[in-house]
Swiss-Prot record:
Membrane topology recorded in Swiss-Prot or TrEMBL: Multi-pass membrane protein
Cystine pairings recorded for this chain: none
Protein name according to UniProt: L-lactate transporter
Outcome (variant: residue 28 to A): Loss of transport activity
Outcome recorded upon mutating residue 250 to F: Loss of transport activity
Impact after mutating residue 250 to A: Strong decrease in transport activity
Record annotation: effect of changing residue 256 to D: Increases transport activity
Cytoplasmic side: 1-10, 75, 130-133, 188-227, 291-292, 347-350, 404-412
Cross-referenced CDD domains: MFS_OFA_like (cd17353)
Protein purpose: Proton-coupled L-lactate specific transporter.
Stated consequence of mutating residue 331 to F: No change in transport activity
Length: 412
């Protein structure tokens, strides 16, 4: 067993994961503040603008799978640092675009590609340092997704509205900052040595009087992807992500349509982001204390209700912020609960590959949710139908996560 004293302090991977996920949060979750400026300058429809965000979410989500495989094989450091360079290039180039197709390539493809490489390796690495608090470690590593959007929403709005600046400066300034953040996050990230465990930690013993446990092993990637329960989790992840990303992609636009000012709508985005961040840590704590399945199902059910309540409450700053907080809480919790569930079901050995494949559901939902929301809004003139569809998917997700139990352990 590796000597505990020869390794880095185990809180370091948590901070590096936080920094990396904050970078990804800045990339993705404040996109709705760009809707009005891009519409005003270019006359693009909501669906056309949402397509850039949808492509970014798709590429981001799909890229996590090869990023996880590469992280398992060659370590997380090179993967994250390469992603940081690509993200910075794509974001900065987005400040020079003159057509929607250029934006689709720079922001959607290049920045999304880089973001996907940054996101997954820290999530797969951090829990390996915390076998005694895996869900909590996962939650802390991903809390930056909410923190990044909490920072980016008002910051981007301030730059956009500042005389002599505008939306292009957001891409330029923030692109440089995000690249630096990702390079720092990747430069020091590494998994623990083989056989390492924290000082004083002893794996839980079986209950008194229980039969001697059989020797078990973790599931391989090939075994996990052949398990029916894996694909039930995949479907549930798609349902929850579809609803959450639809709202994130259109929340500020919904608020502006309801008569709120740009800063008030951005405030609702920040409320969602703050809740999105807080739940990633607190949900991990709840899971470590009370278990995952019932808590998971309750959150899906609550998000279903919030998707419907937005039409009654979304016309005021306070009402929209309350709904945003609820949606942000439940959406953000998924990014603690799904990796923790994947880890619980299939073990840590192939977590990078297993969760990388599972996370592609979020990428597909990220493409479908914002674009479908924008297209239905343009077609019907209201967000009623897209948000109702999202509520139905959340209800389906509730049933799936409540009924899906861990698979049998593999025997060595």
């Amino acid at each position: 067993m590796a000597d505990q004293q020869t390794t880095m302090p185990r809180w370091v991977p948590l901070l590096l994961g936080l920094l990396g996920s904050t970078t990804c949060g800045m990339l993705l979750y404040a996109w709705s503040v760009f809707i009005k400026p891009l519409n005003a300058e270019f006359g693009w429809s909501r669906a056309e603008i949402a397509m850039a965000f949808a492509i970014c979410c798709l590429i981001f989500g799909l890229m996590t799978f090869p990023a996880g495989r590469l992280s398992d094989k060659m370590g997380p450091r090179k993967v994250v640092m390469t992603g940081g360079v690509l993200l910075a290039i794509g974001f900065i180039l987005s400040g020079f675009i003159q057509s929607k197709y250029q934006l689709y390539i720079t922001y959607g493809v290049i920045a999304g590609f880089g973001g996907g490489m940054i996101y997954l390796p820290p999530i797969a690495t951090a829990p390996k340092w915390w076998p005694d608090r895996r869900a909590l470690a996962t939650g802390f590593a991903v809390v930056g997704l909410g923190l990044g959007s909490f920072l980016m929403g008002p910051l981007a709005t301030y730059i956009i509205e500042k005389p002599g600046m505008g939306w292009r400066y957001v891409f330029w300034y923030c692109g440089v900052a995000m690249g630096i953040m990702a390079l720092i996050a990747g430069a020091f990230l590494e998994p623990p040595p083989a056989g390492w465990k924290p000082a004083g930690y002893t794996p839980p013993a079986p209950p008194a009087g229980a039969a001697a446990p059989k020797v078990t092993r973790d599931w391989t990637y090939e075994e996990a992807k052949g398990d029916t329960k894996f694909w039930l989790l995949y479907l549930a992840y798609f349902c929850g992500s579809f609803a959450g990303l639809m709202v994130i992609g259109h929340l500020a636009g919904f608020g502006r349509d309801a008569g709120l000012t740009a800063m008030a709508a951005a405030g609702a985005v920040s409320s969602l982001a703050f809740s999105n961040a807080a739940t990633r840590i607190l949900s991990g704590w709840f899971v470590d204390k009370i278990g995952i399945r019932v808590y998971f199902a309750a959150l899906f059910a609550l998000q279903t209700a919030a998707m419907i309540a937005i039409f009654q409450l979304g016309g005021s700053v306070v009402g929209l912020s309350i709904v945003a907080i609820v949606i942000g809480w439940n959406y953000g919790a998924m990014f603690t609960l799904f990796p923790a569930t994947c880890l619980q079901f299939y073990g840590p050995t192939a977590q990078g590959s297993n969760y990388g494949l599972l996370f592609t559901a979020c990428g597909l939902a990220g493409f479908a949710g914002p674009w479908v929301g924008g297209w239905l809004k343009d077609t019907t003139g209201t967000y009623y139908l897209p948000f109702l569809c999202a509520a139905a998917l959340c209800a389906l997700g509730t049933a799936i996560v409540f009924m899906t139990k861990p698979p049998e352990k593999k025997h060595a």
